[in-house]
């Protein structure tokens, strides 16, 4: 690493801009219709925020998490400060002649430099002083300020540039090298990529003098190790078990760092040459089930947009990764955490690949993850099906072996609740009492009163995975997920028929050592079911389609229950359980359901 660092190119505009011409780039952004929606969103935020004092980060707000377990109050104020910073930074780059933007920007930078800590209360530990705490957002903040220091360069007062550099050294570089190791340094999930990637990126953007080379080399050696650990969290199939949202987050910061590293090292350090990185890059397009509906196993939102910059950047590198449709571009205001790195690169990297009208149909077997995904396109519309095996100790784990979802024309008919409101208990011992996390909130059975248990030993065995032109199928063995002593085996089979209006056949086979007292099949939806005339049918109606659920009412008694849960944004959301009670449990039992789209 020492020799490579000694040969690194100087820091300059070539790290961000085509041909190194900043003024030409921003003139093009102002004049090109490609960016019109982005500019309107950024300017609207500027008008909303202009003249407002930065939101206060008081001790009482900071203490609320420790006292009540609630995160939202402090984080709303914290992220609003980042929104101010991002907005007036972008406006200052877009309209450098406007002194009002610049004045607001300086105040935003000064406010963030004045924060007692850049970390969130939820990530503070009594074992480590605040000044040494590096979490996701402390690392991101240092990366952001360092990048702004470079992009604005001589427009910033020298005092402020020196202050930013000093704070990044004190809050990131020195603790990273002298106060570790940090738990996230060898994490096999998004934390290693975001924390180490942000620190490594800040170093690549700040350390340029001869006397900085040794320090830069030490930081990069540790960062490279963390990136290796991050990639270990993926199988060769490239699936992100944390879900698409955390793919955008963790893999995004991996790419932001890898890009700067590649450019400063003149291509000598090239993460993009690894086959696994290419496989991970292809994960996003596999997740879309039609419209903005996405596979949302784990702590993931059910509907998603794309970071258009990140997506087009990786598409420009890999022929195997299609460019996303422009209509899925994330609105500038969408990111409630107001992250600078993707906001900037959604502009910087916009034109690195072209637009696509829509995702192509596709069937994807993710063998390491134990997922089957099918995106089916017919004259009637776009339909999606996804099912999973896996195990119950995945990152941001849900107890959900055998979970599946169905979507039609961008709407979910059978759902995964995804991520709930993040609180202290949500990541504590009470995690699986939350319906969105425990198996009670998933389309899996309750066996003899038992829900699924958590743990890496609670794993599914994939017995069959196959894709064909007209159908896709998967069979998994799931008995290890349950603590029911009488349960000897439980296999779940899905058969997805890719017709003009697709259908799914579900077969569950149970074997018990003695007859169970109860057995309940459960399916989860956000749609209030209708029970049409005739027996053995339920209808879920949304938009132009309905999903007809057909079952044997001689074998099963249906029960519909309306429930609520707190979503990721702290709002109560209604959902429904469709329970089917087995009327006469047996030692050997097979249950069959048909889910058929109708128009």
Predicted features and spans:
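Catalytic Cys-His active-site segments of thiol-dependent hydrolases/isopeptidases
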Residues: 414-419
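Aromatic-lined, polymer-binding surfaces characteristic
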Residues: 35, 75-287
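An N-terminal structural lobe/cap that precedes and organizes the functional/catalytic core
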Residues: 61-68
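CBM-like, beta-strand-rich accessory domains located in the C-terminal region of large
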Residues: 326-333, 422-599
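Carbohydrate-active enzyme catalytic cores, enriched for enzymes
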Residues: 251-413, 585
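Active-site-proximal structural scaffolding
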Residues: 81, 134, 192, 247-250, ...
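Extracellular structured ligand-interaction cores
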Residues: 136-138, 369-371, 401-403, 412, ...
